[in-house]
Regions:
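Mixed-charge, low-complexity segments
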Residues: 3-6, 24, 243-244
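N-terminal secretory signal peptides
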Residues: 1-16, 30
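Structured, non-membrane catalytic/scaffold regions adjacent to prosthetic-group chemistry
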Residues: 12-17, 36-244
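Hydrophobic membrane-insertion alpha-helices, especially the h-region
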Residues: 23-35
Length: 244
């Protein structure tokens, strides 16, 4: 999801030039001083730039309560109703492969919750809609040996995990819609994970795989020092134990 503010060495892609960055910083300051209309214009421009910014500086711009778009790769391939697949594998009784149409036909749950990035920015009262992860797990049948769930992305790199108890929370969705329509590609669509009570790095974008495992498998950012349990307000997102 999104995947939150990777470092330059972890996120390949075409760099944003120094002049562009300086210009954006100036424009961001103007947006704060120039009112809501200019601010909206900046948000429209900065979103597409942010997804391929290896410097991370775009995430620091004062663009208001809006999403910043990050990817830990140079970008994910696009998927739509014709080629999207979600595989449920691992310690399950029945492996499943769901198309986008399959997921859309299932009972949908609506939530209005904030999205909090570990880097500090927040988008309040986002409208989310999708299939409860617990419903998908029940449909596949969870083996008694399973204690955790691992998620993979069709960007080919990103992964995340939850304990089985966390995954069964009513506010954890396999999201098909957010804000005011289908989840867009930049937001991690057509299907992404949304873990309401945790920082955004736990909400895997471009979701392609759900695997039941016997133990928690640390995800992309956990291998880079982030907490496995990314509860908003109970963790700063970083693992503070220097021995870990």
């Amino acid at each position: 999801m999104p995947a939150e503010k990777p470092s330059a060495q972890d996120r390949p892609g075409a760099p944003v030039g120094r002049r562009v960055v300086l210009g954006l910083l100036a424009a961001g300051a103007a947006g704060v001083l120039g009112g809501a209309q200019l601010q909206k214009g900046l948000e429209a421009v900065l979103g597409p730039i942010g997804i391929r910014d290896p410097t991370g500086l775009v995430g620091l711009l004062p663009v208001g309560n809006t999403f910043r778009f990050y990817s830990v790769t140079s970008g994910a391939p696009k998927r739509d109703a014709s080629n999207y697949r979600l595989d449920i594998t691992g310690l399950v009784d029945n492996k499943r492969t769901h198309t986008l149409a399959d997921l859309q036909a299932m009972p949908q749950t609506n939530l209005v919750r904030d999205f909090q990035c570990v880097t500090g920015w927040r988008v309040p009262e986002v409208h989310w809609s999708g299939v409860r992860l617990s419903d998908l797990l029940d449909d596949a049948g969870v083996n008694s040996a399973a204690t955790a769930v691992r998620f993979t992305s069709f960007d080919g790199t990103y992964s995340e995990s939850l304990t089985l108890a966390q995954a069964r929370r009513a506010d954890v969705l396999v999201a098909l819609e957010m804000i005011d329509g289908p989840v867009t590609h930049n937001h991690g669509g057509p299907v992404r994970l949304y873990v309401a009570p945790m920082y955004g790095y736990k909400s895997c974008k471009w979701l392609s795989g759900i695997e039941l495992t016997s133990e928690v498998v640390p995800g992309y950012w956990e291998h880079r020092g982030y907490s496995i349990d990314g509860w908003v307000g109970q963790s700063n997102g970083r693992n503070d134990d220097p021995t870990s």
